[in-house]
Amino acid sequence: MNSNLPAENLTIAVNMTKTLPTAVTHGFNSTNDPPSMSITRLFPALLECFGIVLCGYIAGRANVITSTQAKGLGNFVSRFALPALLFKNMVVLNFSNVDWSFLYSILIAKASVFFIVCVLTLLVASPDSRFSKAGLFPIFATQSNDFALGYPIVEALYQTTYPEYLQYIYLVAPISLMMLNPIGFIFCEIQKWKDTQNASQNKIKIVGLGLLRVLQNPIVFMVFIGIAFNFILDRKVPVYVENFLDGLGNSFSGSALFYLGLTMVGKIKRLKKSAFVVLILLITAKLLVLPLLCREMVELLDKGDSVVNHTSLSNYAFLYGVFPVAPGVAIFATQFNMEVEIITSGMVISTFVSAPIMYVSAWLLTFPTMDPKPLAYAIQNVSFDISIVSLISLIWSLAILLLSKKYKQLPHMLTTNLLIAQSIVCAGMMIWNFVKEKNFVGQILVFVLLYSSLYSTYLWTGLLAISLFLLKKRERVQIPVGIIIISGWGIPALLVGVLLITGKHNGDSIDSAFFYGKEQMITTAVTLFCSILIAGISLMCMNQTAQAGSYEGFDQSQSHKVVEPGNTAFEESPAPVNEPELFTSSIPETSCCSCSMGNGELHCPSIEPIANTSTSEPVIPSFEKNNHCVSRCNSQSCILAQEEEQYLQSGDQQLTRHVLLCLLLIIGLFANLSSCLWWLFNQEPGRLYVELQFFCAVFNFGQGFISFGIFGLDKHLIILPFKRRLEFLWNNKDTAENRDSPVSEEIKMTCQQFIHYHRDLCIRNIVKERRCGAKTSAGTFCGCDLVSWLIEVGLASDRGEAVIYGDRLVQGGVIQHITNEYEFRDEYLFYRFLQKSPEQSPPAINANTLQQERYKEIEHSSPPSHSPKT
């Protein structure tokens, strides 16, 4: 597309200008043409959609709704709410107003992306999983979240200008489901046939299974039924049926977005080395290649009479292509049990990456011309607004790192520096907005602050990636933390200083990105290239270590490795077991943990060594001998308590979160580098370049959103305490009724069942003797071990429900944390069973007394033996 926009008036990151008068700022159109969309409603729509998604994610992370419970909501959304919504809209759809050229343009664009991804996957994928990838990856790249996320945004943009565009959502969505997805399903069925070597399954049966999966989809089924009733009922739904359908359909949007947030919990984990490149390529195909192809196909094939409508349709096609991946793709991957990690992780990443792209795209599509002044002021306003919100997010994220004391450990120490640099960038942008154009000294000072911190954010991406690589090899390589920190702040300051000394100030430009002209552009490009190169090489080299096959995930239930395994209680057993056995087998057993409190002083009862047992048989602690261990351990003297503290401070390195942070930042660095090179080698960049400018502005001053999403919602510091506070306030309403009952009936029944039917088996399976003093040991177990055991025996269907079950055992006095400082967690924290006969024990002086009384009440109120229930 030709453009009259002078290159010197464009920016690499943002146009820094004085505040524009209101009449101009709010009227970007340079002509009197009516706007093609209502941009003022876009931001509230995005906040509404992603706010509900965030609520669902928080509910899942706080275990308010477990993954098993979420399946019920998902079934309601997919089998009741969405089919009802589809049926009604297909019945009332006016097919005479449909632009069919638009539909087959979208079909051609989707089919092109589908077959490109499919062919490339077949060519480069490994033979053992070639067909599963060739089936699911093209579906990932073409199936959009049309109804839950797409429809509210299209409604906000086009409800007042082109309301007929809303009906295209219901017509475009079945294209993927009915025409493209069957091909992917057939490839997946071929992969299943190859894996099982079932010779009886012929080709016709494979194709039939693929088509059957399509027909079983409620969306496809209701589309056909709706079209049939469109002609039968003459596009009029009976009143009583309409009210019923409206009741179901109106519940779709909120529940679908909430369910989308629930499905994101714990999806990004154990990313393998091949997943990084695959994720970037798939997300690029979905969010960049597909929108461009959709737009170009509509431009090429749509032969509408109205030029305005033609342009609006092509813009709408581009916006449609930016919609993120549908959650249904993750469901397909789970059903086939193929490529689940890549598909689910990609769904989460694409959903959040699509938000700024949709915002930028919709904003740019409101400009009928390429007049540089409105574009400059638009970027200015967007950058200023984003900086304010981003700075608040960064302050919150920094507070989380400081309060959790993670800033003292690697790699969070370096992440803290990155967040500080991002905060200075936002503050610098806000200050620049108020600097007078003729105030040269003020401009120089703010320029130094802004660009030294902006270059620092670029470099910290590469430095953080190389620190992650060194962290994987820290047993052989000493991490030069001081050098990394000095480089992260010193090199950007040096570059800006060189620009100030040697560069020629461009007096005609009020834009900070062109303050020193071409020299500044080259400096920015070199900085970006070096950071991308360092980050890319470091992330690839991380896979050369022995444990590079997987990284620690978001889910705290995954196995953790402590920094120095040779000096900790968390030593891994050489046997190939799921969890490390910690100080098991022949250790002298004592009648009590050595760090028990007696009259305020530490004491150790007499040691009664036990006979050596075979290494093949675990030592089962004698709880009858441990009757006197009723006081909590002292964290200053107990080895187990000390190791817990070490684990909490340094064991959770959150490597996957940091790798994800680096990947998202690299995408933004690529965009900035492309913008630099595009400007340097093309004097008439065009509209696409301006969109890239907007994206760069959103990225540079909106990095705080990425950091907040990854580090701002700490589970144990924010979510769980907030959840417990709400539960406390809620339960206070019933205090008068429950004053005479130490524990609720639900907790009491859970504890009764566990004591009579499962306690002894659980002790034999997971409780081990672990050293807690110089010559003493205690029978304990890890919280994550109990969670896995509860799932194994059928007392819980997932880890979320198992945590709830374990928390009830703690409240009922059945188990207890060794120091009584933590609630039940799915982590490597040590817990112990309280003795069966608390009345035989001496009274405790501390908070354990209440738990012992609760346990005694449960034990004495337990019914006689019943048939076990699992």
From Swiss-Prot:
Phenotype for F43I: Strongly reduced cholesterol-binding
Any matching Pfam family: DEP
Lumenal domain ranges by topology: 1-38, 101-104, 155-167, 235-243, 295-315, 368-381, 436-438, 502-520, 682-691
GO cellular component, one term: extracellular exosome
Glycosylation sites: N9, N15, N29, N309, N381
Result of altering W678R: Abolishes the effect of cholestrol depletion in mTORC1 activity
Main location: membrane
Binding positions (cholesterol): F43, Y57, G266, K267, I268, R657
Region named GPCR: 380-717
Effect of F352A: Abolishes the effect of cholesterol depletion in mTORC1 activity. Abolishes the effect of cholesterol depletion in mTORC1 activity
Residue intervals of the DEP domain: 757-835
Biological processes per GO annotation: cellular response to amino acid starvation; cellular response to cholesterol; cognition; intracellular signal transduction; negative regulation of BMP signaling pathway; positive regulation of TORC1 signaling; transmembrane transport
Impact upon substituting L177W: Reduces binding to indole-3-acetic acid
Record's subunit section: Homodimer; via the transporter region and DEP domain. Interacts with the GATOR1 complex and prevents interaction between GATOR1 and KICSTOR; this interaction is disrupted upon cholesterol starvation.
Function: Cholesterol-binding protein that acts as a regulator of mTORC1 signaling pathway. Acts as a sensor of cholesterol to signal cholesterol sufficiency to mTORC1: in presence of cholesterol, binds cholesterol, leading to disruption of the interaction between the GATOR1 and KICSTOR complexes and promotion of mTORC1 signaling. Upon cholesterol starvation, GPR155/LYCHOS is unable to perturb the association between GATOR1 and KICSTOR, leading to mTORC1 signaling inhibition. Binds indole-3-acetic acid and may play a role in tryptophan metabolism.
Domain comment, as recorded: Cholesterol binds at the interface between the PIN-like transporter region and the GPCR domain; these two regions likely coordinate to sense cholesterol and regulate mTORC1 activation.
Protein name: Lysosomal cholesterol signaling protein
Species per Swiss-Prot/TrEMBL record: Homo sapiens (Human)
Organism lineage: Eukaryota, Metazoa, Chordata, Craniata, Vertebrata
Gene (UniProt): GPR155
